[in-house]
Regions:
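C-terminal membrane-cytosol helix-exit motif in multi-pass small-molecule transporters
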Residues: 157, 161-166, 185-210
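Juxtamembrane intracellular "pre-TM" segments in multi-pass secondary transporters
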Residues: 1-13, 200-241
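Hydrophobic core of transmembrane alpha-helices in multi-pass small-molecule transporters
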Residues: 24, 106-121
Length: 267
């Protein structure tokens, strides 16, 4: 039993290292590309367009939708397969968005952003993967490591925007904002490889959580049923309202800040 405990502790430490590396890289990809999203909308629709926030809105909707898809896939196939699936879709979304930017195609750009949101969903779900093997009194600490790692990527990502722009323009002749999207897709490729090769064994499988709900006859509720349950519980309604208000505030600030800075010559 002691040896088993030691092995689990060692495996948890290794799992956290793998997830943190993925968080840093993926967070850099997300922050670099999403920062220029509003600029792309302005380039396509004009500087005075009232639709500058559509980029982050689409990205957020994609993240919300894919969170459901990836969570279900993880419950059946494990954390590694779910994260691989999410990062793969983010790579596809990044390349679609980059192609769309180069062609000034708004529909394609919106499509790419939606798929790109799966990268954010994967990063968020990584926090739960960090807790699979953690002791009950260490789960919050395990999640904090993932959050801490993502801050490095979030700070590092925007620094890459200018080099990516210059590289794309000088080497490939791309339009100004194409480079950051292609670079972000490449960063997600690294995150995908990191998870595919190093997140072994799967922490959810080791913890006994893989297919555990089906094994005891537990059925995941549909969205409508879940919303009705939330509606019937006061604290749940307050929690949901708080999350919605916080998300709206965050998206509004994130969208308009780069636009405001650009207008004042601080792009």
């Amino acid at each position: 039993v002691t040896q088993q405990v030691v092995d689990l502790v060692a495996l948890q430490k290794r799992t956290l290292r793998v997830l943190v590396v993925g968080q840093v890289v993926a967070a850099a990809a997300l922050s670099a590309a999403v920062t220029v999203g509003a600029f792309v909308i302005q380039d396509i629709l004009g500087q005075e367009t009232p639709w500058g926030g559509i980029s982050n809105a689409t990205f957020t909707m994609g993240s919300a939708f894919m969170s459901q898809v990836l969570a279900q896939k993880m419950s059946r196939k494990g954390r590694r397969v779910g994260l691989q699936y999410g990062y793969s879709l983010a790579i596809i979304g990044g390349f679609i968005a980059g192609f769309a930017v180069n062609r000034s195609s708004l529909p394609l750009f919106i499509l790419g952003l939606f798929f790109y949101g799966s990268g954010q969903a994967s990063n968020l779900l990584s926090r739960y993967a960090a807790m699979d093997l953690a002791a009950p009194d260490q789960r919050s600490q395990a999640m904090s490591y993932i959050l801490f790692g993502s801050t490095f990527g979030a700070v590092f990502g925007p620094v890459l925007i200018q080099p990516a722009q210059n590289f794309g323009i000088e080497v490939f002749g791309w339009s100004k904002y194409t480079g950051p999207w292609i670079a972000s897709a490449c960063f997600f490729s690294f995150a995908l490889i990191n998870v595919a090769l190093r997140l072994r064994p799967d922490p959810l499988e080791v913890s006994g959580g893989l297919n555990s709900q089906q094994g005891v006859g537990v059925v995941t509720p549909k969205l409508g049923a879940a919303l009705r349950t939330i509606k019937s519980i006061r604290n749940a309604r307050v929690a949901l309202a708080s999350m919605v208000i916080s998300q709206v505030t965050m998206v509004a600030v994130m969208t308009m800040t780069p636009v405001h800075l650009k207008l004042h010559g601080h792009e």
